[in-house]
């Protein structure tokens, strides 16, 4: 599991800005609006090859006893309990406040490892701006600027120092782990029970029935699988209960832990933006994907056509590699094809791609459609090899590769996917430009003979060309 970093502090100290910096997103803009900070913002980032989860929280008011502030305080305390490391954010420009002291006392009582980050210190003397914060008794303050990125990597390095210094490892299991994810009440637990052939988990017609990720091992046709039933991922504004908010973390961790994800869509309602957000997170995590459109038996032909059009419009980024199944989890209709699709997606995600064949495929693709020119030069793609699996990573070597456009990258991705049959898994392509051995070097001075020859060539050129 990834280590979880929780951002805590009073309002307007820059927690959401730091969250966006760590996750390289803008997902936490809503956290700046009063009354909306009850909703957690979850994301994942990387420091080099070291992944981590980040939880953004609302402004912390530990002394609040009623209303929204009280609810926010309870949820922040729950977040602290879930944290591996708490990043306590304070404002270096406004200085130490009484509320900062109250929050610091609450964090000391929690027993969680806490790092103190003094934000908004750009252009200020570090020793001066951090001096008064030693009073909080939380160790040496780290001066950062979330807006400009100053010392943010140093802060994360300090937070992760007690965790194994290892990149994300390829799966060592010899059988697929399958996470069942989707919005609440789309039939995830019903589908789990149908695949297992028994009432293994509670399936109830009420959103939020599943609170935690449940791992279930089973065998089918002589092969072992692990199913992961997860809590529903609702749109931020509709999440009310604290326990449900933190079940989101478990669901995101289940996606990271899985080899293949089955995304369950509800055909009885329109495909929502939240379905697209979940699909985007799965794609970003690099997990193989199978889509199950549930409750298909409840629709007539016109409604089925409308749902298919809705899928084409809202989920186009998943259609080039993921298989779609139209099922009824309750009656079992269409579910027999799910596990074969899972096997195919798992095989594609873990596939070994030979270097000679990759290079031949690359050169054939370039010969058929060369990359477009960038100025006076054209990118040169020389050879390719595999750099990892789950998802497959293809590394292409050459020169001037920074000029390869996204459209040509998609062309190469589709070519590799068709050649190797990589259906059901995302495919990553990384370009690496060879090192110039003469970079940073100046030419040696000419000898007397070389200088005379150069002079004769210049004279000849002037006489001939004027």
UniProtKB/Swiss-Prot annotation:
CDD domains: EngA1, EngA2. The keyword Transferase does not apply. Keywords: GTP-binding, Nucleotide-binding, Repeat, Ribosome biogenesis. Residues 433-466 are annotated as: Disordered. PROSITE patterns: G_ENGA (PS51712). Gene3D superfamilies: 3.30.300.20, P-loop containing nucleotide triphosphate hydrolases. It comes from the Bacteria. This is GTPase Der. It comes from Nitrosospira multiformis (strain ATCC 25196 / NCIMB 11849 / C 71). The gene is der.
């Amino acid at each position: 599991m990834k280590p979880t970093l929780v951002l805590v502090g009073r309002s307007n100290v820059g927690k959401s800005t730091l969250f966006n910096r760590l996750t390289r997103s803008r997902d936490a803009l809503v956290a700046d609006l009063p009354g909306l900070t009850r909703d957690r913002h979850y994301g994942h980032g990387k420091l080099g090859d070291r992944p981590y989860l980040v939880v953004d929280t609302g402004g912390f008011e530990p002394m609040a006893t009623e209303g929204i502030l009280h609810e926010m305080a309870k949820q922040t305390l729950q977040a602290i309990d879930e944290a591996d490391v708490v990043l306590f954010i304070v404002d270096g420009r406004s200085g130490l406040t009484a509320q900062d002291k109250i929050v610091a006392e609450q964090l000391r009582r929690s027993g969680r490892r806490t790092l103190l980050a003094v934000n908004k210190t750009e252009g200020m003397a570090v020793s001066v701006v951090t001096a008064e914060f030693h009073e909080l008794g939380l160790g040496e303050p780290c001066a950062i600027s979330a807006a400009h990125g100053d010392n943010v990597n140093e802060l994360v390095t300090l937070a992760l120092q007690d965790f194994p210094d290892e990149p994300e490892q390829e799966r060592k299991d010899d059988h697929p782990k399958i996470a069942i994810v989707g919005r609440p009440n789309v039939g995830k637990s019903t589908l789990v029970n149908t695949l297992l052939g028994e009432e293994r988990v509670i399936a109830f017609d009420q959103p939020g029935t599943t609170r935690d990720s449940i791992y279930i091992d089973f065998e089918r046709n002589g092969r072992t699988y692990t199913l992961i039933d997860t809590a529903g991922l609702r749109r931020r504004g509709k999440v009310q209960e604290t326990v449900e908010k933190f079940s989101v973390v478990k669901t995101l961790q289940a996606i990271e832990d899985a080899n293949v994800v089955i995304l369950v869509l509800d055909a009885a309602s329109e495909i929502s933006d939240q379905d697209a957000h979940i699909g985007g997170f799965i794609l970003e995590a690099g997990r193989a994907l199978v889509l199950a459109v549930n409750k298909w038996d409840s629709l007539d032909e016109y409604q089925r056509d409308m749902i298919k059009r809705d899928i084409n419009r809202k989920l186009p980024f998943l259609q080039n590699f993921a298989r779609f199944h139209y099922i009824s989890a309750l009656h079992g209709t269409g579910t027999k094809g799910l596990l074969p699709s899972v096997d195919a997606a798992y095989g594609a995600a873990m596939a070994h791609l030979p270097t000679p064949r990759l290079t031949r495929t690359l050169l054939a693709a370039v010969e058929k459609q060369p990359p477009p020119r960038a100025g006076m030069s054209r990118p040169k793609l020389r050879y390719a090899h595999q750099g990892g699996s789950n998802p497959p990573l293809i590394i292409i070597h050459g020169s001037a590769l920074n000029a390869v456009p996204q459209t040509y990258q998609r062309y190469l991705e589709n070519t590799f996917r068709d050649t190797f049959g990589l259906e059901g898994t995302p495919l990553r392509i990384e370009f690496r430009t060879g090192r110039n051995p003469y970079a940073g070097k100046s030419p040696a001075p000419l000898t007397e003979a070389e200088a005379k020859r150069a002079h004769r060539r210049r004279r000849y050129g002037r006489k001939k060309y004027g």
